[in-house]
Amino acid sequence: MKKYRDHYFLKAKRENYPARSVYKLKEIDKRFGILKQGMRVLDLGAAPGSWSLGAAEKIGPSGRVLAADIQTTETVFPPNVTFMQEDVFERSAEFEQALSETGPFDVVISDMAPKTTGHKFTDQARSSNLCFEALAVASLHLVEGGSFVVKIFMGPDVEAYVKQMRTLFTAVKSFKPKSSRSESKETFYIGLGFKGLPEFSEQEGED
C-alpha cells in the first residue's frame, strides 16, 4: 500500500469515517465553499456513508441530508441524515416522496460509480450514464443558486457532459483532490449557481 493511501486510510479509521472518500468532499468544500450551516443536501451513491457524514457535520443539526444508494450500509448516521436504499434509475414512490419533503436541496453531491468490468470503454460508458442521471435528478431538485458535485471517470463523453452542465450552472469547475489516488481517472466537476430549468413555452411545443 502506498504511503498516501496509508495516510488517508488510517486517518479515516482514526476519525471514524467508513471510507477515505470523505476527504475528497472536504477538499472540494474547502476550495469552493459549497456546504453551510442549515443547508439541505442530497447525496447520491452515498454508501458506505462518508460523504453523508462529512456533509452532516458541516451543515449542522439544523441541516438535512437525504442519502441514497443501491447498496445498503451499516454506518450509523446522526439524526440529520436519512439513508434510503434506492436505485437512482428506478426511484420508488417512497424516495420520490422523500425528495419532495426534504427538498428542494441547496447541494446535490454524487460519488456514484458503476461496478467495473475491467473493460475501459464499458466502464466509462456506465460511469457516464450515472453522471447524466445524477445531473437530471439535480436539475429537478436543486434550488436556484444551488451547487452540484459529481464524480466523473474521464472519457469521450465528458466534453458533452460538461457542455450540458454549463447550460444549467453559471460556473462549472473541475477539481482533482489530493486525496484521490494519483493513478485514478476520476475527476470531480462542480456546478455553481444553478440557473433553474429552462422554461418551456407553449409555442415551442406546437408543430
From Swiss-Prot:
<feature type="active site" description="Proton acceptor">
    <location>
        <position position="151"/>
    </location>
</feature>
<keyword id="KW-0489">Methyltransferase</keyword>
<protein>
    <recommendedName>
        <fullName>Ribosomal RNA large subunit methyltransferase E</fullName>
        <ecNumber>2.1.1.166</ecNumber>
    </recommendedName>
</protein>
<dbReference type="InterPro" id="IPR015507">
    <property type="entry name" value="rRNA-MeTfrase_E"/>
</dbReference>
<feature type="binding site">
    <location>
        <position position="111"/>
    </location>
    <ligand>
        <name>S-adenosyl-L-methionine</name>
    </ligand>
</feature>
<keyword id="KW-0949">S-adenosyl-L-methionine</keyword>
<keyword id="KW-0963">Cytoplasm</keyword>
<feature type="binding site">
    <location>
        <position position="51"/>
    </location>
    <ligand>
        <name>S-adenosyl-L-methionine</name>
    </ligand>
</feature>
<keyword id="KW-0808">Transferase</keyword>
<dbReference type="InterPro" id="IPR029063">
    <property type="entry name" value="SAM-dependent_MTases_sf"/>
</dbReference>
<dbReference type="Pfam" id="PF01728">
    <property type="entry name" value="FtsJ"/>
</dbReference>
<comment type="similarity">
    <text>Belongs to the class I-like SAM-binding methyltransferase superfamily. RNA methyltransferase RlmE family.</text>
</comment>
<feature type="binding site">
    <location>
        <position position="49"/>
    </location>
    <ligand>
        <name>S-adenosyl-L-methionine</name>
    </ligand>
</feature>
<dbReference type="InterPro" id="IPR050082">
    <property type="entry name" value="RNA_methyltr_RlmE"/>
</dbReference>
<dbReference type="GO" id="GO:0005737">
    <property type="term" value="C:cytoplasm"/>
</dbReference>
<feature type="binding site">
    <location>
        <position position="87"/>
    </location>
    <ligand>
        <name>S-adenosyl-L-methionine</name>
    </ligand>
</feature>
<dbReference type="InterPro" id="IPR002877">
    <property type="entry name" value="RNA_MeTrfase_FtsJ_dom"/>
</dbReference>
<dbReference type="GO" id="GO:0008650">
    <property type="term" value="F:rRNA (uridine-2'-O-)-methyltransferase activity"/>
</dbReference>
<keyword id="KW-0698">rRNA processing</keyword>
<comment type="function">
    <text>Specifically methylates the uridine in position 2552 of 23S rRNA at the 2'-O position of the ribose in the fully assembled 50S ribosomal subunit.</text>
</comment>
<feature type="binding site">
    <location>
        <position position="69"/>
    </location>
    <ligand>
        <name>S-adenosyl-L-methionine</name>
    </ligand>
</feature>
